Amino acid sequence: MGQTRVAATTAAQSPAAELSPETNGQTEEPLQLLGEDSWEEFSIAVPWGTVEAKWWGSKERQPIIALHGWQDNCGSFDRLCPLLPADTSILAIDLPGHGKSSHYPMGMQYFIFWDGICLIRRIVRKYNWKNVTLLGHSLGGALTFMYAASFPTEVEKLINIDIAGPTVRGTQRMAEGTGRALDKFLDYETLPESKQPCYSYDEMIKLVLDAYDGSVDEPSVRVLMNRGMRHNPSKNGYLFARDLRLKVSLLGMFTAEQTLAYARQIRCRVLNIRGIPGMKFETPQVYADVIATLRENAAKVVYVEVPGTHHLHLVTPDRVAPHIIRFLKEA
């Protein structure tokens, strides 16, 4: 256990060329890819409504379960999935309260980490899937990490993008912020739609572009907002599709000790793709500590640093796809 390959990909060494590698002096057949149109909308009934998704590839095979980041949606994978092999299936999910999925009923809070683990389990049990492969970005990667730790014998491969484990907060910060978070949650819960800000399409795109602070470019924002906003006919403008209550994220955060305890439970093969510079973490050392802990316990760990923003799989998917393809092909 603990076998590791560490690779640093530079802009001058573009991984896109690895899609058609040469082996033993002979050029392999070009890899057949999924392409942009190989998906269908997919709906999963849950007790509070539906979880909506995009199913990429054939429904005749068990899919990779893909989970997006906080306040994003499954459109986050719209540029990556087309670059994956045609014999791959991916179920990219809109997490509850995101994209086209149902919001939680009034009176309920989003405990995003614990809710997400339960959602994955609900789906796996519903379809009786075995030896699952999980793909996650940011929050989605924290959820897949937690699931792999909670069900260590039932996950075959774990692929995470620019996240090592759940977001870590200092205990003092969590204690000091709890009251404000609860009041903020209740304010959002009681805010009527008539008082929610409404924007023109162009205003919405600019607002989101500015909010992501360089992590995405304008074409990427347009991809995300295909599922991230909804039209309001009465105001002739657009509202965010996501549940406003999701903006309260402090509740349910982890300490470093908790995250490392879960890391020690993971036994599957792991690919971790970290963007450089990627996301700015409050506790950057924890990322390295999680990877080190995984190396001690997981069947195999591949840690790769790739030039890009936190949303590198969306903005520069050609840099990310070759690493995933290679990892999926490995026995």
Swiss-Prot record:
Positions with biased composition (Low complexity): 7-17
Region of interest (Disordered), ranges: 1-28
Enzyme class: hydrolase
GO molecular function, one term: serine hydrolase activity
Active site: 138
Tissue specificity of this protein: Ubiquitously expressed before embryonic stage 11. At stage 11, expression is concentrated in the foregut and posterior midgut. By stage 15, in gastric caeca, pharynx, posterior spiracles and anterior edge of midgut. At the end of embryogenesis, expression is confined to gastric caeca. During third instar larvae, expressed at low levels in gastric caeca, midgut and hindgut and high level in fat body.
Annotated GO biological process: digestion; response to toxic substance
Keyword Cytoplasm found: no
EC numbers, comma separated: 3.1.-.-
PROSITE patterns in alphabetical order: LIPASE_SER (PS00120)
Domain called AB hydrolase-1: residue spans: 63-163
S-S bridge residues: none
Domain of life of the organism encoding this protein: Eukaryota
Record key words, sorted: Detoxification, Developmental protein, Digestion, Hydrolase, Serine esterase
Family stated for the protein in its record: Belongs to the AB hydrolase superfamily.
Summary of the function given for this chain in its UniProt record: May have a role in detoxification and digestion during embryogenesis and larval development.
Protein's name according to its UniProt entry: Probable serine hydrolase
Lineage of producing organism: Eukaryota, Metazoa, Ecdysozoa, Arthropoda, Hexapoda
Gene this protein is translated from: kraken
